Every structure is written in C-alpha cells, then in structure tokens.
Amino acid sequence: MKKYISYLASIFKPSSSVAKTDNFKDATDAYNKSNYAKAIELFSPLATEGNTAAQWYLGWMYKNGEGVMQDYKEAALWYRKAADQGDASSQFNLGLMYSAGDGVTQDHKEVVKWYQKAGDQGDLGAQFNLALMYKNGEGVTQDYEESAKWYRLAGDQGDVGAQFNLAQMYESGEGVIQDNKESAKWYHLAGDQGQAKAQYRLGMIYDRGIGVIQDFEESAKWYRKAGDQGDARAQYLLGAKYDEGIGVLQDHEESAKWYRKAGDQGDARAQYNLGLMYKNNKGSGQDLKESAKWFRLAAEQGDAGSQFNLGLMYDNGQGVVQDNKESAKWYRMAGDQGDARAQYNLGLMYKNGEGVIQDYKEAVNLYRLAAEQGHAKAQSNLGFMYAIGQGVTKDYVCAHMWCNLAASNGHRIASENLDKIAKGMTPAQIDEAQDMARDCKT
C-alpha cells in the first residue's frame, strides 16, 4: 500500500506574507530554472530571518541534494524550523523523515505527531499516511475508526488512494458500519479518476449487484477500463463475459484477446481458458500445441483443471509427444487437488500399468476417491473390482452398491453389471446394498 512522498508542485503553498518579497521571487525563479546554487544563496538569508517558505525550500534542497551536498540532518533542521512555525508542508515532510529515519532517529510516535499537525491543516499526504498508520497500528494503537476518519478527509479532497481504501472499509465494515452503497460511492469516485483497482471492483459489484443494481453491461464497461490499464483480473473477467455473451455480444475472438492479455500476465484462469479455446477450436482456431502451452503455464501454477488437461494431452499425444509417465505425473497433481477426472484416469493407468507400475490396490484407491465425488465411470469400475476381487477383497454387496450408484448416474455398463452381480446375491444382501446406495445418495 502506498505512502505519500513529498513532491514540490502540490505540497508547498507559500503564504502571501512571504511570497511577495523580491528576494524570494528571485530565489524561486532561480530554483525553477534549476540554478540551484543561486537559489540556495538567495533562500539562505530569508530562511535565517524566519521565512517559512525559504526554510521549506532549503529543507527540500538539502534532502534532495539540489545545489548542495545531500544532507538529511540539515534538511530536517530547516523543515523543523518551518514546522515549528506551523507550516503544514514542512510538518508533513518532517514526519516523512522521522518515518524513514533520514537525518533523525526513526520514531513512529514523532511521525504521528507531525502528520497530525499537518493533517489538521488539511495536508493531503499527512491525512493519507495517518489513516494508514492507524489502520496498521504503526506508532499508534490500531484504530480502524480513526483510520476511516483520515481516509475520508483525504478522500474528500479527491485523493484516489484514500477513496479506494475507504470504499474497502465500507465494503468490509472495518472502522465504519458496513454499507455496500457507500462503498460503491467511494469506488465510483476513485474509478472515475482512473484508478484501475477501483474500476475492477466496480466491475465486480455491478456483476453481482452489491450496493448497486445488477448491470452486466456496466460491469463490462468497468472491467474494460481496468483491463485497458493492465489489470489482469479485469482482463480475465472481461474475456469471460465475451466468452459467454454476458453484458456484451458473444465474441470468442474478443474473448481470446482478453484472456491472452491476462494470461500473459500470469493469470492461471485465463491461461486455462485459452488452453480450452485452442483445444476446442473456439475463437483462435484449433492449435493443440498452443493449447498444451497454455495448459502447462496454468498447470505449473497449480491449476487442477489445467493439470488434468495437460495429463490428457500427454495421454493421447495431442499437441505433445505421447508420454504415459508425463501423463501420470500431471494426473497425480490434479488428483491430489481432488479432480475426480484425474483420479479416475490415474486409476485406469494403475489398473493397466500404463506410465506407472501396475497396482490394483492403488487403482482401487483412486477409483474410490473419484467415485465418492460422483464420477460414474469410477463408480462402475470400482464396483467391478469389488465383484471380481481385484485390488480388494471380493464383496458383492459393495460391488452392487457402487454399480447401483453408477447406474443411477446413467452408466449403461454398470446397469448391466448390476443385474449380473445381483444373481449371485441373497435378497438380504441386495437390500443391504440398496440401503448403502441410498445412504450415499443422501
């Protein structure tokens, strides 16, 4: 999160009592022409006489090494002289020096003291930094209400960062009464000034109707504004809108464009969707190598769907050289994250000894993981292995239960096997198996 730093154009506003002297005007003219040595020569006697504007300039020039050797202690000395006379800009800059430990011993309490003095006079940077310190409990007791107060003061002056942070506080109810409408108001103020983070949040709240009337077109508008500034999250979500035709006319080429912008920045969701689009000839033309490339980028970030799809491509030799070991590796990664498709496919590989050492027990374990998530093929295969005692002790009751579940999920072979298994069971065993299946369904 940002902290303000001092900057010449907007921090210093010389008072009329000091700005009209000829020497002061000559000094500022010299400074503006980058004739720093002359400016120092002219500012110094004015500063010694107590001219706060000249004192501020000397503080600035010593701090930045303009016309003199950089000297933080000397900078702090001149800022203090002006600050003690009530100059808000110097108070703020002295607070900055205590914050960084430049020319003075670092002291957060001293920082707060000087920011408070400047903030009470309306110094925007001091107000923002005070809000940040109260929010983080830095130099003061953590106080979200006080933080919100200072953000509001800075936000009312148009500071975009304060407006965004205050919007977040209203959204979460941190330091203020939670109020989505008020949050949306502050996001609008920041977004209208071009802040990408606020524009992204506006896209989200219009998408979901949080604090505003749900409006998909308005959502897309704000995602576009943020996306045009490089916000990867907004780029992905705008791509999804074009993909589905929500708030915009469906346009797969436009969708792929925005996914690519986000994917190039490392957004795994966009990379996954690009992988699917290249695989399925959607928006960019079918290109299995390109598909595998995008799946890999997302898979390496831990995206389970991409890990499964990359495993599938190695399994089938699509866009990559067929490689069962590599396929099993990616299936395992996806399966470890709970992807039922990957668990089932890896179970098949263990059953058949493809890319791994054949292991019926491991096949059963993997089928079970997928079957418990409702994967019909895994349920059917698990039922069959119970029926023949492969990798498990033969158990017709369990076999019947799993085939029953698979059949209820529309698996034809499981339905056929169910009838065969039932022929070897007593009515009591069938009742038990059916009860177990009902329990699983509920």
Labelled PLM ranges:
Residues 8-37:
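N-terminal leader/linker segments that initiate helical-solenoid repeat arrays
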Residues 23-30, 45-46, 57-64, 93-100, ...:
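Hydrophobic face of amphipathic alpha-helices that form TPR/SEL1-like repeat modules
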Residues 1, 8-12, 412-442:
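Terminal, low-structured helical/coil segments at or just beyond the last alpha-helical repeat
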Residues 23, 30-35, 48-51, 64-66, ...:
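Short helix-capping/linker turns of helical repeat alpha-solenoids
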